[in-house]
Every structure is written in C-alpha cells, then in structure tokens.
C-alpha cells in the first residue's frame, strides 16, 4: 500500500518516519498541533489520514481530537491538491459584487466544482470566506497571489494560467 502525494509515492513506513521527524521539529513549542499539521501538509502536500494517530500519540491527545482539528480547518487537505490552487471568495462583500457568477463561470470553464481537482491534476478549486480584499470584490487567490475585481477577462487569464 502506498500514498500518492504531490507526484511522489510515499510508503507507510516512510510516512511514519517523516511524520515523526516533523513532530520532532515542532513538538517542543507550546500548542504544537496546528504548526505540526501545517508542516505535515507542507511535507506531503496534504495531511495523510495515517499521520493523525502518530501525531495524536506524540502529543498525548485522542485520535478524534487530531482528526477533528485536521478536518475543521479548511486549509488542511485530506488529499493532494492540483498543481495550482484557486480559491474564490464567497464572503458577503464578494457575493454582493457577483462572486456567485464568477464561481459559476470558473466551475464551467474548469469542469470542476468546489473541493474538486481537475482530472489532469492541473488545479484544485476551493471556496474561501474572505481574502481581506473587500474593496476590490469579487476576489480570488491563485497559488497564494490575491486577485481583485475578478471578471470574465480575469477568469480567462486564470484558466489559461492553470492549464499551462
């Protein structure tokens, strides 16, 4: 059995060793669970379910608590993301400026919905609830870069970028 993560194959024993190494780097700080989960996601491209019991054991918390935190926060993925991650703001300010139409156009252009990755692995589409760019609504974020005043032209550019 192996895990597919960010284009590399990860064996369970390798996953355990890499998880333990991440815990060792962050385990001595106060409140280490969130930093460990961030580091695990950076290491694997997502938070593998198999890493959660290892984290729970090391931090002396229940498996349910580790799982609950990992699934509560939207930034933690349970599967690898596409090569690009496109986040579309769905907060009130963006909705009032047409984010629903933007989302519909993007979904149609990419052929995927929210929380989905294109079959070719090019892009993952995620909703986000406020990028802090309300004055330039509707807004989006592509690979960490914020884009304001998203319109049909911007959508064409975004789709072209993620399809390269």
Regions found by a protein language model. Name each.
Residues 1-164:
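Signature of N-terminal electron-transfer/Fe-S-associated modules in redox systems
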């Amino acid at each position: 059995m192996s895990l597919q993560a960010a284009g590399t194959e990860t064996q369970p024993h390798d996953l355990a060793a890499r998880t333990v190494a991440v815990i060792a780097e962050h385990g001595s700080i106060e409140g280490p669970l969130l930093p460990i989960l961030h580091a695990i996601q950076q290491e694997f491209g997502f938070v593998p379910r198999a890493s959660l019991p290892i984290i729970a054991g090391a931090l002396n918390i229940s498996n349910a608590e580790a799982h609950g935190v990992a699934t509560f926060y939207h930034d933690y993925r349970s599967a690898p993301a596409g090569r690009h991650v496109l986040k579309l703001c769905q907060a009130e300010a963006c909705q009032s400026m047409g984010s629903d139409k933007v989302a519909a156009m993007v979904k149609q252009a990419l052929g995927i919905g929210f929380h989905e990755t294109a079959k070719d692995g090019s892009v993952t589409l995620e909703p986000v609830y406020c990028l802090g760019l309300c004055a330039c609504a509707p807004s989006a974020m592509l690979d960490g870069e914020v884009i304001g005043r998203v319109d049909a032209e911007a959508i064409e550019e975004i789709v072209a970028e993620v399809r390269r």
